């Protein structure tokens, strides 16, 4: 088997996870690796060693390999802070790329900028690259993109620009509530009940002001009525998504939404929207990420 040597390397480095792809000619994916060493667990001087552990076998000792990276790696607490583009703006601007200082002469690491919004205040890092990648594949798109995740983003796209966006901490809230509150004693770790999820979505959407009470009811139901742990977990997920969909109505009502995220999360959002009469379709997260970073790499080399 021939040894894999990358023409360039794409990296999506988030808060809790890092993914890297060895890219060959015509943007072909030669190899993929991932790590749970996210931004939140690393000091500034640890980013380069972590990256090298993942990609070293893809490097050619006779040349410099470009690494294009997006995500929280460019945050203030990351490898090196990158600037924010201000909405309305194109998702990616290579004039704002930041080069990280590296000790290994075989790599040159470029970090893409994030996007900020002044009123209401909001920020994104990583999602702008995925939005750019989606737009690259859908040049005439005008509409709404939703990126489910730890911090879900809803963005209005107009004429190739991010016009406005809104963030919901739904994923993080689910993690905290299911793992670090009293409710953890009533929920399963991985189980799922679709009917409970859908009922939770409807309740969360119709009565968002009752979310604090509905959350405690999960604990009470488990004690008083022996609520199944899988049902409790699924209801919790549905409640939180329902509250988010209530708050995001201005984005999805009357619009066809494109969901860009993991297959599991995107399917949950798709089902949640469907229950409420919304329309949506899924777009591959990996395709969006690689398309965005590939565009940045090409522009960098043509500049």
Ranges and model annotations:
Residues 40-43, 115-148, 153-207:
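Glycine-rich phosphate-binding loop plus the immediately following alpha-helix
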Residues 17, 254-272:
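Glycine-rich phosphate-binding loops at beta-strand->alpha-helix junctions
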Residues 8-12, 66-68, 143-147, 258-259:
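Short glycine-aspartate micro-motif
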Residues 3, 8-46, 283:
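Short glycine-rich, Thr/Ser-proximal phosphate-binding strand/loop in the N-terminal lobe
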Residues 58-124, 159:
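Short beta-strand-loop/turn "lid" adjacent to the catalytic site in phosphate-handling enzymes
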Residues 204-247:
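Adenine-nucleotide phosphate-binding core of ATP-dependent small-molecule kinases
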Residues 29-65, 74-77, 81, 183-187:
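N-terminal phosphate-binding loop and adjacent alpha-helix
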Residues 239, 246, 281-303:
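Glycine-rich phosphate-binding/hydrolytic loop that grips phosphoryl groups
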């Amino acid at each position: 088997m021939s040894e894999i040597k990358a023409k360039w390397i794409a990296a999506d480095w988030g808060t809790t996870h890092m993914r890297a792809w060895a890219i060959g000619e015509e943007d072909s994916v030669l190899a993929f690796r991932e790590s749970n060493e996210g931004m939140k667990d690393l000091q500034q001087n640890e980013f380069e060693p972590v990256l090298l552990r993942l990609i070293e076998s893809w490097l050619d000792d006779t040349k410099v390999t470009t690494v294009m990276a997006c995500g929280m790696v460019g945050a203030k607490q990351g490898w090196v802070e990158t600037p924010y583009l201000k909405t309305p703006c194109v998702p990616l601007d290579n004039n704002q790329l930041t080069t990280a200082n590296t000790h290994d002469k075989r790599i040159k690491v470029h970090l893409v900028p994030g996007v900020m919004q002044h009123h209401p205040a909001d920020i994104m890092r990583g999602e702008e690259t995925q939005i750019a990648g989606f737009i690259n594949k859908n040049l005439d798109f005008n509409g709404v993109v939703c990126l489910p995740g730890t911090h879900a983003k809803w963005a209005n796209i107009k004429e190739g620009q991010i016009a406005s966006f809104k963030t919901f901490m739904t994923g993080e809230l689910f993690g905290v509530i299911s793992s670090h509150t009293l409710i953890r004693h009533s929920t399963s770790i991985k189980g799922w009940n679709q009917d409970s999820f859908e009922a939770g979505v409807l309740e969360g959407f119709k009565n968002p002001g009752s979310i604090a009470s509905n959350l405690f009811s999960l604990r009470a139901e488990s004690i008083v009525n022996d609520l199944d742990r899988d049902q409790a977990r699924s209801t919790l997920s549905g409640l939180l998504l329902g509250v988010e969909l209530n708050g995001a109505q201005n984005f999805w009502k009357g619009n066809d939404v494109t969901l860009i995220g993991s297959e599991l999360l995107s399917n949950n959002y798709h089902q949640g929207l469907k229950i409420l009469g919304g329309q949506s379709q899924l777009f591959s997260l990996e395709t969006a990420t690689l398309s965005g970073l590939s565009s940045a790499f090409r522009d960098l080399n043509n500049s």
